[in-house]
Amino acid sequence: MMMVRRGLLAWISRVVVLLVLLCCAISVLYMLACTPKGDEEQLALPRANSPTGKEGYQAVLQEWEEQHRNYVSSLKRQIAQLKEELQERSEQLRNGQYQASDAAGLGLDRSPPEKTQADLLAFLHSQVDKAEVNAGVKLATEYAAVPFDSFTLQKVYQLETGLTRHPEEKPVRKDKRDELVEAIESALETLNSPAENSPNHRPYTASDFIEGIYRTERDKGTLYELTFKGDHKHEFKRLILFRPFGPIMKVKNEKLNMANTLINVIVPLAKRVDKFRQFMQNFREMCIEQDGRVHLTVVYFGKEEINEVKGILENTSKAANFRNFTFIQLNGEFSRGKGLDVGARFWKGSNVLLFFCDVDIYFTSEFLNTCRLNTQPGKKVFYPVLFSQYNPGIIYGHHDAVPPLEQQLVIKKETGFWRDFGFGMTCQYRSDFINIGGFDLDIKGWGGEDVHLYRKYLHSNLIVVRTPVRGLFHLWHEKRCMDELTPEQYKMCMQSKAMNEASHGQLGMLVFRHEIEAHLRKQKQKTSSKKT
């Protein structure tokens, strides 16, 4: 039994060994039959059990690595060549720009584009800050102030006329005309932009433009302040634009409501009843009937003719149902500075806009809005340049009669001049007048106190708006320079008197009148002798 069992186990062992050998043989045959061949014999991978398999793998890998390394090196060389060519082209372009700018006299920064753009924006904003848009700049003298010019759609009102230009004229130069048109169009584009639109928004056109003022500072740029009609009565739209010798920059877009802005017109007076009667006729028409937001303060010196002045006020009050006036009587010698100072301090209401005026001033209702729009408490005071009328007796000497006053108020070179040396007419809030210290009451006689106050504002941080206005006139009256004046005051008085009489050409005709008459007599004699 044991022998049989041993034989069976030996037989089974041999069968298992044979099966294992058979499986191994089949596996070897399968590997030999299914080994992949390359397209080329030298790229065929050797078998793992081959005696050269390891060396073959290393050789093929080294060859592939070398090919990859060569390809990468080639790409790097091409990229480097492209970078070098791009840098060379950029340098050529930059040098060309610098040469062009140098030829034009410009100095451009050769910094990277990002830095250059940032520096440019910073520079433009610094130009806006230096242009007295948000705050005033302290100035040494009144001659350092840069005045504004004013303009409408048709006319420009300018200070610098020379011998060929006119105080009021249509802009003849194309660059000036295009400049102002561009400013108005830029403002209209802003007003009609989607950001400004609202459910009740209406389109703005050039007909809504009222007036603008502008001034150019050669080291900064041009500042524009444009005023448009608002959506309601007594409402306005004002846009402040700045051209820093380049594109216009929008600085502010303000909505201004002047419906409740009261103006206190202060007039110092002594005698001059006829002039006061004429002034009150203008005041009634412009302030009471048209504007309706004005208070009148009359500061009267002395008692002579005081009843006549009071009678004119009372008659105007009854006829126009006007009660907004104050009459202050002072003793002593007339002093314009003292009268204005007392009138300003006498006001007991809230902060009010003051208009320092004279009895020989004519103004329109449009000027009153100009006064409101160019003042702001704690920030801005208005010193308009008025148009001063020449002596009508000289201007219209060749006419049969002098025309009515309204027909005389024409802004032309032959009829008057911009009184750019006068600082008496001014609009400023009472708080600013008090804070600046008011007038210097130690100054006696003619002139001086106005310039002193003006200089104090120039030395402060308030913005001083100085511009000619088309609705403010100084009516001619004979000027007497008293012997009691100091030499400096007397000189100023005589200069003012000479300026008030006539234009340069008209005065020349008066100076050479005798020569002209002699020439006419000779011509007449020659004509008579030829006839005989």
Swiss-Prot record:
Residues 1-14 are cytoplasmic. The chain crosses the membrane at residues 15-35. It is a single-pass type II membrane protein. Ubiquitous, with the highest levels in placenta, thyroid, bladder, prostate and adrenal gland. Detected at low levels in the other tissues examined. It catalyses: 3-O-(beta-D-GlcA-(1->3)-beta-D-Gal-(1->3)-beta-D-Gal-(1->4)-beta-D-Xyl)-L-seryl-[protein] + UDP-N-acetyl-alpha-D-galactosamine = 3-O-(beta-D-GalNAc-(1->4)-beta-D-GlcA-(1->3)-beta-D-Gal-(1->3)-beta-D-Gal-(1->4)-beta-D-Xyl)-L-seryl-[protein] + UDP + H(+). GO terms for biological process: cartilage development; chondroitin sulfate proteoglycan biosynthetic process; dermatan sulfate proteoglycan biosynthetic process; endochondral ossification; extracellular matrix organization; heparan sulfate proteoglycan biosynthetic process; heparin proteoglycan biosynthetic process; proteoglycan biosynthetic process. It is an enzyme of class 2 (transferase). Residues 36-532 are lumenal. Keywords: Coiled coil, Disease variant, Dwarfism, Glycoprotein, Golgi apparatus, Membrane, Metal-binding, Signal-anchor, Transferase, Transmembrane, Transmembrane helix. SUPFAM superfamilies: Nucleotide-diphospho-sugar transferases. The keyword Metal-binding applies. InterPro entries: Chond_GalNAc, CS_glycosyltransferase, Nucleotide-diphossugar_trans. Residues 57-100 form a coiled coil. It is linked to Skeletal dysplasia, mild, with joint laxity and advanced bone age: An autosomal recessive disorder characterized by skeletal dysplasia, short stature, short long bones, advanced bone age, joint laxity, and facial dysmorphism. Belongs to the chondroitin N-acetylgalactosaminyltransferase family. This is Chondroitin sulfate N-acetylgalactosaminyltransferase 1. It comes from Homo sapiens.
